[in-house]
Amino acid sequence: MQIFVKTLTGKTITLEVESSDTIDNVKAKIQDKEGIPPDQQRLIFAGKQLEDGRTLADYNIQKESTLHLVLRLRGGMQIFVKTLTGKTITLEVESSDTIDNVKAKIQDKEGIPPDQQRLIFAGKQLEDGRTLADYNIQKESTLHLVLRLRGGMQIFVKTLTGKTITLEVESSDTIDNVKAKIQDKEGIPPDQQRLIFAGKQLEDGRTLADYNIQKESTLHLVLRLRGGMQIFVKTLTGKTITLEVESSDTIDNVKAKIQDKEGIPPDQQRLIFAGKQLEDGRTLADYNIQKESTLHLVLRLRGGMQIFVKTLTGKTITLEVESSDTIDNVKAKIQDKEGIPPDQQRLIFAGKQLEDGRTLADYNIQKESTLHLVLRLRGGF
């Protein structure tokens, strides 16, 4: 078949290849045509640097695909690698070297196997397939080398079907790594996995240690449903925004999507569904929000205000609130202060009993207004 190779100068080379050709073979063909030695060639496809021993088929490169050719600059540069013991190693590298290559050089110098090496630069753990240039690592930059402890530990992953999977991991494993291990065992693609621990959704780039996940901890695996769905968000101005979401999206995710569309910072957004204010860490599925559901968006006014709540005993409680707070929210704040369950609270303002789903603004309750708290007797009606 024919494929194309585009150089940084904009020139396009046409090559006759077979799916079974290795990247080495392709580089040799480029050398025949253009005279560029293979060791100065880097080939990129779909944003990935191609490895010499792999075949075109491995990368799903098909007829008339276009590869990009980047030249490795000769001459390279020096970088430093500092270990936890304080020792500094000097390496000769090129910007186009991958993190794998750098780990191999460290192994040559120090004898530490690459799979026990974690490299950190500017507070970020470096991923094997990326290059030094990708991370803007320049001459005389210093990387930090942290060793992965051997031996690791076992953790458990519980699925919604109740099945428990046992994994061999290390504290330094990233959530990506854990998802890859789950894929190896269960065949579930990482992009369909959501991992939850202590009520928090775990982010791919972080490590188990970051979340204080220790041996024999149990994570919960929730599947992201493919395909997603549309929901609507209605603002107080009457405008309706359409969002593409999945049931497994958290309310945080939804607020981020609204920010992308409308530019409203998440901390100024309050989302209401079925009269309830939605909490950031929960998912759409938690609230039974289904396709074509409509959420209501209320803006939080900056700064908030104080109001007073007077009880029948004559005690006055001061609360920090915002106009956009619902009566539910106010009852929750009273519970936090006084320990009275919301279902035993009745709030009265201007002679009116206040309804849970409404906001302070709905009742024209302003700063330093006084509400009256009456307790509902148990068993009553």
Swiss-Prot record:
Keyword field contains Ubl conjugation: yes
InterPro entries: Ubiquitin-like_dom, Ubiquitin-like_domsf, Ubiquitin_CS, Ubiquitin_dom, Ubiquitin_ubiquitin-like
Residue ranges occupied by any Ubiquitin-like domain in the UniProt entry: 1-76, 77-152, 153-228, 229-304, 305-380
Superkingdom per UniProt: Eukaryota
Cross-link (Glycyl lysine isopeptide (Gly-Lys) (interchain with K-? in acceptor proteins)): G76
Gene3D superfamilies named in the record: Phosphatidylinositol 3-kinase Catalytic Subunit, Chain A, domain 1
Crosslink site: Glycyl lysine isopeptide (Lys-Gly) (interchain with G-Cter in ubiquitin): K48
Coiled-coil blocks: none
A GO CC annotation given for this chain: nucleus
Record localization: Cytoplasm; Nucleus
Family of the protein in this entry: Belongs to the ubiquitin family.
The protein, known as: Polyubiquitin
Encoding gene, per UniProt annotation: PU1
